[in-house]
């Protein structure tokens, strides 16, 4: 009987000791490596390549691993397949730019239920499928900035302009369009005559831009709020020999637009730094995976802190204007 009691006590002590060893932090005092699935709208897009560059920078600082993935075309179905793969890999966090806010929510809700920290960036996921969303800037500031550029480029701040957007279901572009329309109240001489959708695909965006130019021969400005669409719009204006007559502006990447800026096709444009966006969302994702809480200000490393509102949305920074005076410098970076 005494031997049995000793054996039981030994087993209890062993279980307790083993549990303590399993729960203890690594011997070197460093936190365990966090794996973050960084999901792009589509691969082969320069904007998201730059996002990944910033994400890898943050991962290096934090001792984390970023798995950069995405579909080959910007569809919800492609992203759902990508997300299911990340869930199967049991990543610690997922950061996604949504092609469709509602279509992704059920899959991401399943990820949340399994303990994966889910955040969106750039283009928001519906609230049911995320803990927080990091907007690159506020929608209001983006709308005001784009309309401000149109007003600067249109003769005497007056005239017609058309817009090439991404997909009809893209959360961020639709919000920016709404704020652009609101900002028009401050510029009564401007008229938005059409919105076309290039689906963030170069060839389709080009065709839509050419169609707008032919349907509205009196356009003063052609705008794109998609980085892919802005390059396509610039090419369309140049190919149609309308440089100088129709100004092109919007949201794009310095590395893709520097040549068009120097030729006067795109006199100026705006964008936040996608490297900073990737860096910031990775800082947030790792912070949450290590026990952080979005009810409190969350560190974004060198970008400072972000405070998320009651809707779970926070803004990184305001857009920056690029023109002939600075585009070459930034083109070397992204």
Residues covered by each model-derived region:
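Periplasmic-binding protein-like
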Residues: 38-39, 90-98, 117-121, 162-163, ...
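Bacterial signal peptide processing site
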Residues: 18-22
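Hinge/cleft segment of the Venus flytrap/periplasmic-binding protein
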Residues: 32, 168, 172, 183, ...
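Hydrophobic alpha-helical
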Residues: 96-112, 180, 198-260
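Short, solvent-exposed amphipathic alpha-helices that sit
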Residues: 47-61, 142-149, 171-190, 204, ...
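Extracytoplasmic "Venus flytrap"
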Residues: 33-58, 62, 67-81, 91, ...
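Hydrophobic alpha-helical segments within soluble ligand-binding/sensing domains
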Residues: 79, 134-161, 204-206, 253-257, ...
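Flexible loop/hinge segments that line or gate small-molecule binding clefts
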Residues: 102-141, 152, 160, 254-262, ...
């Amino acid at each position: 009987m005494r031997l049995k009691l000793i054996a039981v006590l030994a087993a209890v002590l062993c279980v307790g000791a083993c549990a303590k060893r399993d729960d203890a932090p690594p011997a070197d005092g460093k936190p365990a490596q966090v794996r973050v699935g960084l999901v792009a709208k589509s691969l082969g897009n320069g904007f998201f390549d730059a996002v990944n560059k910033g994400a890898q920078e943050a991962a290096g600082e934090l001792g984390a691993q970023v798995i950069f993935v995405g579909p080959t075309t910007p569809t919800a179905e492609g992203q759902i397949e990508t997300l299911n793969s990340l869930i199967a890999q049991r990543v610690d966090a997922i950061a996604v730019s949504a092609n469709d806010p509602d279509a992704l929510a059920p899959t991401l809700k399943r990820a949340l239920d399994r303990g994966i920290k889910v955040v969106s960036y750039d283009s928001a996921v519906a609230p049911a499928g995320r803990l927080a969303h990091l907007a690159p800037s506020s929608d209001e500031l983006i709308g005001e900035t784009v309309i401000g550029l149109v007003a600067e480029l249109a003769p005497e701040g007056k005239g017609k302009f058309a817009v090439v957007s991404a997909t009809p279901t893209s959360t961020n572009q639709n919000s920016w369009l709404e704020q652009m329309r609101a900002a028009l109240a401050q510029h009564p001489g401007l008229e938005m005559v059409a919105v076309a959708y290039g689906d963030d695909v170069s060839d389709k965006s080009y065709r839509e831009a050419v169609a707008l130019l032919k349907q509205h021969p009196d356009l003063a400005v052609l705008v794109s709020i998609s980085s892919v669409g802005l390059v396509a719009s610039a090419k369309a204006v140049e190919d149609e020999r309308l440089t100088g007559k129709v100004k092109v502006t919007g949201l794009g990447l310095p590395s893709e637009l520097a040549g068009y800026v120097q030729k006067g096709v795109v006199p100026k444009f705006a964008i936040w730094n996608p490297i900073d966006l990737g860096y910031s969302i990775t800082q947030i994702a790792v912070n949450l995976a290590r026990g952080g809480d979005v009810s409190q200000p969350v560190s974004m490393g060198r970008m400072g802190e972000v405070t998320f509102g009651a809707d779970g949305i926070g803004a990184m920074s305001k857009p920056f204007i690029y023109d002939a005076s600075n585009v070459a410098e930034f083109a070397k970076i992204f």
